Amino acid sequence: MLLTLSPAEILHTYQTLEKIFPKPIFPKQFQKVHTLGDISHLYDAFFFDAFGVLNLGETAIPLAAERIKTLRQQNKQLCIVSNAASVSRQQLFEKYTKLGFDFSLDEIVSSRDALATYLHTHSAENYGVTAPIGTKLNDLNGSFINLIEYPDAMDTVDGILLLSSQDWTSSLQETLIQSLITKPRPILLGNPDLVAPRDNGFSLEPGFMAKQILDKAHIKALAFGKPYDNIFNLAKAKLKPNTALSRTLMIGDTLHTDILGGCNAGLHTAMVSANGFASTIPWQDTIQKTGICPHYVIDFI
């Protein structure tokens, strides 16, 4: 979906969701440092948000790949923790390899992985899915109908999977909302992000679609990904035995997903302020108003 909101409006929307987000204990104040290199000696493991930290859209952020290589040379544990739901882990691996990063397949955890884990024991049968036509869903347990390809199926499916906003239109969104008002059904949310930073701005993401449905149809989606435990539990399971959570750092550009979720998972957190969503808002005022405080604010990794 095309962006029609200003950064201030996006921030306000995140703030209206605070009542349904986890409520961890945050640091009382943050420490401002220039780059991740200034504090990397304090940590054994690093969890990286992708969009806004490693890349903007299809472009790698300058020097990000070099930082990853440096941390690897220091024998640090590394993992991407991303709210990417529309592609498989293999596709994410191929994307970041192409962008110049040397993450292994096992060093990537996505909200789709958290969703797939849930569906192992809760099959989604006859679910309508929001995703580009041709999206592969082989890793997800259930039967799915693509609502872009078959919009008339909205009234007949038994549930909705909000997987991607790509190719989803405002008209389709309104039709879906009206269908859910008439016939309420369960909703699975594969990506809680409201927006994603791109090369030339932001795109509206499935989290925004879920917020509209919550407001108008009064159906709360079951969400997978940051800031929720389901994705962090998968990432923490990859840590070496005896790795202290207090020596594990979550790095992201969004207070309400990366920082809130990282703190809720018992990790230390660092917000990137020169790239991504944080660079578009008065982040110091936002930290003060929301109380969502990272351990560090860094310019970039």
What residue ranges belong to the model's regions?
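Asp-based, Mg2+/Mn2+-dependent phosphohydrolase catalytic module
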Residues: 1-76, 90-109, 116, 120-128, ...
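Short glycine-rich or small-residue beta-strand-to-loop segments that form or flank ligand, phosphate
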Residues: 77-81
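Conserved phosphate/oxyanion-binding catalytic-loop motifs
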Residues: 84
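Conserved nucleotide-binding/hydrolysis micro-motifs of P-loop NTPases
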Residues: 87
